[in-house]
Structure formats: C-alpha cells, structure tokens
Amino acid sequence: GGWTGVMGKRACTPAMMFSVALAMLQRDGRWLLQLRDDIDSIIYPGHWGLFGGHLEPGESPAESVVRELKEEISWSPPATLQPWFSDASGGRNVHVFRGELTVPLDQLYLKEGQDLRLASLEELRSEWIWSDHCREKRPIAPGLNIVIRRLLAEMHDV
C-alpha cells in the first residue's frame, strides 16, 4: 500500500475499517426503512436508512444483522437472511442481507430511530420519503444509494 498524508501515515487497511451489517427486508413489494434520530453525534441524522449496525468483536455479519434487528425492532427473522452483497467503497465495509419481513409493520416495536416505513421503489428512487412521525419528507442516507442502484440493476436483469 502507498504512503499518504504529511505525517507519512499508512492509508487505512480494510482490516481497520468499520464493518456494518444491514437488512434489506421486503414485504408486499416494499422495503423496510428506518428514520435515524435527529442527533448530531450519529452518522446521517434524520435520514432514512436500513436497520442494522456495527459488528461486535468476533461476530459474523449474519449474527450481527439478526442481533441488530432484535435490538432495533424486536423482530427475529424466522429464516436465515440471504447475504446479498458487500461494498467497501464508502470507507466502511458494508454487508447487506435481504429477506422477507414476515409480520405487518404494526407488529414491530421500534426501539432505535424515530420512525419506520415500508417504502416503494418509486419512493426509494425519489430520495425523499414521507415520515408520519415527523409530518414531512426526509432524505435517504447516501449509503442507501448503493442498495437502490443494486435493486434497480437486478430488476432490469429480470
């Protein structure tokens, strides 16, 4: 690897990157999103994103995504979520899983974030999605663009 910066510090190696595991859950042709809290200390406050989070030490992405779903919406997938793709272009190692949300939205108990919603493909493409909780449209997190592009590419392949 090359040397960068005035202090001659080595560029970050992938091993040093944050790893996150996220869930792209589908129900009735819509996808489950989380509206992040309006807290300045978190990444992309007040943006729509996917449920999931950072891997704990020694945890696999698959274990992490199941734990996070239980912590964030009190739901455990009845079947194993399928690894969909991984992406490290945004400075963190993102593992995206996909699966079916097997319960209606009103059976989820939101414990992290300020709102949740099943968004249509049209809404995802518009990049601004209505929040009932906030009574206004909120932007999608930049990281979600990779997921949406992947989704659109697959739909064109079909």
Segments from the language model and where they lie:
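Conserved Nudix-box catalytic region and its N-terminal flanking loop in Nudix hydrolases
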Residues: 30-71
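Unchanged
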Residues: 54-137
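Charged phosphate-binding loop/patch that engages nucleotide di/tri-phosphates or the phosphate backbone
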Residues: 136-158
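Conserved N-terminal beta-strand and adjoining loop/helix that marks the start
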Residues: 8-33, 51
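Short secondary-structure boundary/capping segments
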Residues: 15, 23-24, 40-41, 86-87, ...
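Short connector loops at helix/strand junctions that flank enzyme active sites
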Residues: 18, 26, 45-50, 91-94, ...
